């Protein structure tokens, strides 16, 4: 389906959201076949959006030379060119993208998830239930993949930029799919990628300090307020009772959502879980509401995944799906790089994407409970130029829970990975024999597995199935923790 945007529609949409300041040199009517913010993708007649910290006026000049008919910006850059001047160019891009694609989100059952940890796993619990109940693959946007009915593609952002996001919604409809489950990052709201998106369901999983830094959020309060926006932009709000700042989250949901459900571990919740039994693999647990009790089984390890599963059950029940389909859909979910357990000759390797305080804490506590007495080794690092407090938190947690730590590179960016490792080592503690710094991640994974003894557990944390490292502004190939572990174990 070909999409177009006329000047009258564009200006009307921007005025409706209070964004349009003026439209100098614009004729009465002007069709814009393409909409883009990439000067390299401009076609004749395009509307070009000047957005982003890296925008330079020469990008606009290139766009105009390539045939752009109009540009959108917060200030005039070219006095002769038609322009739509707006108060917030990122919001304007979201508004124009939705208008350009015909507001496809309004025709979807759109499920959005936010939280500091567990978004990806819960996304796939929900998706698998929907796939089972509906009898076909439903759409998903996650840190693992983007699937809208065509080919599944790798994702590099938790939540796509607004123009790509609206295209995903439109592609989903074009493939005859009516359900889409997606992760909604705090950055997605901060950068207005999901501005104006009407979610059918919004889930708030949990909250702890993360993504604080000069390139992300200036404070924890900013991080929290961005995540809170999902509760203000959904019809059904679902909240996990154990999250920090629960009362504020609940109040925001009650003020804006048509319906609010709470799930957790006690009977004060709308749905709660009890009677947890360890299985091999996974867990069986009982989900209760005021009128019923029902057993469910998951095969994923990690007790924290019971909370993720309960959230998925709460949402899909509220959407009217039968318990039998929910139980079948949730029973055998596996997410690449999330609690992937590999065992050989009495040795256990766990590949997990744990990368912040909340996820490391939950992972360590779960393993201590499910593998009592087993020595725990961990291989981990921290990314460059992002959330510097992670280095403190993860260092302290490794010092508290791990018997030995392999410190290595994890998307170092423009920083020296060895220096990041040395900084983390300073927080592990005074027992210097308990860690080693090996900046080459592939070599570190190989060595950690070679040194793993029967009865010991090794956590490969932070990268999961990702087959790249972010280095010096590039995506350098990396075999992935999961692939190296399988190779070294002969699996």
Regions found by a protein language model. Give the residues of each.
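Phosphate-binding loop of NTP-binding sites
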Residues: 95-237, 241, 245-258, 310, ...
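ATP-dependent carboxylate-amine ligase
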Residues: 1-21, 44, 53-55, 131, ...
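Short, polar loop motifs at secondary-structure junctions
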Residues: 69-78, 142-145, 242-245, 265-266, ...
């Amino acid at each position: 389906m070909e999409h177009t945007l006329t000047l009258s529609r564009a200006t009307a949409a921007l005025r409706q959201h209070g964004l349009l300041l003026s439209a100098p040199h614009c004729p009465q009517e002007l069709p814009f076949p393409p909409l883009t913010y990439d000067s390299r993708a401009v076609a004749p007649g395009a509307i070009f959006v000047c957005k982003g910290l890296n925008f330079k006026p020469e990008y606009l000049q290139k766009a105009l030379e390539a045939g752009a008919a109009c540009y959108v910006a917060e200030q005039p850059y070219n006095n002769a060119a038609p322009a739509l001047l707006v108060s917030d160019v990122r919001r304007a891009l979201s508004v124009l993208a939705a208008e350009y694609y015909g507001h496809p989100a309004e025709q979807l059952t759109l499920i959005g998830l936010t939280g500091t940890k567990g978004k990806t796993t819960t996304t796939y619990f929900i998706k698998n239930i929907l796939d089972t109940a509906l009898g076909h693959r439903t759409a998903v946007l996650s840190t693992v993949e983007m699937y809208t009915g065509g080919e599944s593609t790798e994702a590099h952002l938790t939540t796509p930029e607004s123009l790509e996001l609206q295209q995903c919604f439109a592609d989903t409809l074009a493939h005859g799919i009516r359900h889409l489950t997606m992760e909604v990052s705090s950055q997605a709201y901060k950068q207005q990628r999901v501005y104006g998106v009407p979610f059918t369901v919004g889930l708030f999983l949990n909250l702890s300090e993360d993504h604080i830094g000069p390139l992300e959020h200036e404070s924890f309060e900013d991080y929290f307020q961005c995540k809170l926006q999902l509760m203000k932009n959904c019809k059904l709000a679902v909240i996990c009772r154990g999250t920090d700042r629960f009362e504020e989250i609940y109040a925001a949901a009650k003020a804006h959502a048509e319906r609010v459900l709470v799930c957790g571990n006690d009977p004060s919740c709308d749905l709660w879980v009890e009677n947890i039994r360890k299985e091999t693999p996974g867990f069986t647990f009982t989900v209760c509401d005021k009128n019923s009790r029902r057993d469910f089984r998951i095969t994923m390890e990690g007790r924290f995944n019971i909370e993720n599963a309960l959230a998925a059950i709460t949402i899909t029940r509220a959407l009217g799906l039968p318990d039998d389909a929910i139980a079948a859909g949730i029973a055998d979910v596996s997410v690449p790089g999330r609690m992937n357990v590999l065992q050989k000759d009495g040795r256990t390797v766990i590949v997990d994407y744990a990368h912040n305080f909340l996820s490391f804490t939950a992972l360590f506590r779960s393993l201590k409970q499910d593998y009592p007495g087993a020595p725990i080794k961990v291989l981990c690092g921290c990314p460059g130029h992002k959330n510097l407090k992670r280095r403190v938190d993860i260092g302290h947690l490794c010092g508290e829970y791990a018997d030995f730590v392999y410190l290595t590179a994890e998307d170092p960016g423009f920083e020296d990975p060895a220096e990041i490792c040395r900084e983390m080592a300073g927080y592990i503690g005074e027992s210097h024999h308990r860690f080693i710094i090996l900046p080459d991640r592939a070599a570190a994974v190989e060595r950690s597995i070679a040194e793993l003894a029967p009865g010991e557990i090794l956590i490969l944390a932070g990268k999961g199935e990702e087959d790249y490292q972010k280095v010096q502004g590039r995506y350098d190939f990396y075999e992935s923790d999961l692939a190296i572990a399988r190779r070294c174990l002969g699996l």
